[in-house]
A protein has these predicted regions:
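Short, small-residue-rich loop/turn micro-motifs
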Residues: 13, 68-70, 117
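C-terminal helical "tail/cap" subdomain of flavin- and related membrane-associated enzymes
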Residues: 97-167
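FAD/FMN-dependent oxidoreductases across multiple families
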Residues: 22-101
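Short, structured loop/turn "capping" segments at alpha-beta junctions
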Residues: 16, 42-45, 123
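Electropositive phosphate-/nucleotide-binding environments in soluble metabolic enzymes
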Residues: 3, 26-27, 79, 83-86, ...
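Conserved FAD-binding catalytic core of PHBH/FMO-like flavoproteins
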Residues: 1-30
Length: 167
């Protein structure tokens, strides 16, 4: 569909949100999206576009906590953002509540949140490196790579780690 990106289809109350995202910052996605829609045998009713930041950004700005897209919590390679945003939002909420309750100073909550977010740097860097590699490998390698990644021994080792994000 899009070599340097991802496609999605989310059912929403009687209709669907279908889209494409580009890792390469490509902004001409309408034609590939229309081709994707034709393949699904659906017609678009409305188009909307934006960027989604993938890769950890600043978890705090001054005395403000950043969560989700504002902090770059979207996972590189997969484009998944909801689960990391919920996870980091919960961490943030617990720390803010601790500060409100007087259990920790506010500055300590900011510091603890930064530490919790930055503890995930390695995982984000690995996904970013995989994203970089996939974008540059010959198209003929993608099928065999997907088959390799789907092997039971590989899935058993890596899929639980991916699914356990934030646990």
């Amino acid at each position: 569909i899009l070599r340097e990106g991802a496609a999605w289809l989310f059912p929403v109350a009687g209709h669907s949100r279908i889209g494409l995202g580009s890792y390469a910052g490509a902004s001409k996605l309408r034609k590939p999206l229309e081709e994707f829609l034709r393949g699904l045998d659906v017609a678009a009713t409305r188009f909307h576009g934006t960027y989604f930041p993938a890769g950890l950004g600043a978890p705090t700005v001054g005395r403000v906590f950043a969560v989700g897209d504002s902090a770059g919590h979207c996972l590189p390679l997969t484009g998944e953002g909801i689960r990391p945003a919920v996870y980091f939002g919960r961490v943030c909420g617990e720390l803010v509540q601790s500060a409100i309750d007087g259990r920790i100073p506010f500055d300590r909550a900011l510091q603890a949140y930064r530490a919790r977010v930055f503890a995930h740097r390695r995982a984000y860097a690995m996904l970013r490196a995989l994203q970089w590699a996939v974008r540059r490998m010959p198209a003929t390698w993608l099928g065999p790579l997907a088959e390799f990644g789907g092997r039971p021994a590989i899935r058993a080792r890596w899929w639980p780690r991916y699914l356990d994000f934030g646990k």
